[in-house]
C-alpha cells in the first residue's frame, strides 16, 4: 500500500519547520526531493491542489489546474541535517490558547535591536511574559513542568502556524545555545531561543502608590 502522507520541511540558520501533508493519491516509492522555497512559493496562488511530476533534474508543478512549470531540483546531499529533539527533552502540554497568548505578548516586545532579550517573549513555569521596558504583558499559565525559561522570538513562521499547538519542549545544546520545539497538529517547529537571562519584569509594574 502506497504512502498517503508527505513530509514538507524547510529551514534556515535559526529555525526549522516540517509539515505532514495529506496526499490525494498514494505514492508507491520513497521520494526525497529538494527545491527552492521561494520558487515553489511563487507558484502557489491560493488554496487548492498541487500536482507534482518528478523528473531527473526538475519537478513539474501544477497549481490547482493551472499551467505546468518546471522547477530545478537541488542535491539532497547538500541539504543540512534536520535538527533532532533529544529524548530527555520532555514535552510540556500547552494550554489551548497558548498561540494566541504568544501573539498578544509579541505586541509588547522591544523593537530595539540592541535589546535582544526584550525583543523576545519569555516563557516560564509561571506563564508568558513580554516587556519593552515601558509596557508589560503577562499571563499566568500552568507550565510548572517546564524545566527552564526560554525566550522565544515571535517569527513570521510562528505567526502563520494556525493549526492547534500541542506541546513545548526545551533543551540546551552545548554550553549555551538554547533550543525549543513546538509540536502541533501535523507540524513540528524547532528554533533557537535567545541566550541570556530575562530581566526582572516585575520592575515594570506600577508601584502601589501610583494610580492605575
Could you say what each language-model-derived stretch is?
Residues 1-212:
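Structural preference for solvent-exposed beta-strand-turn elements
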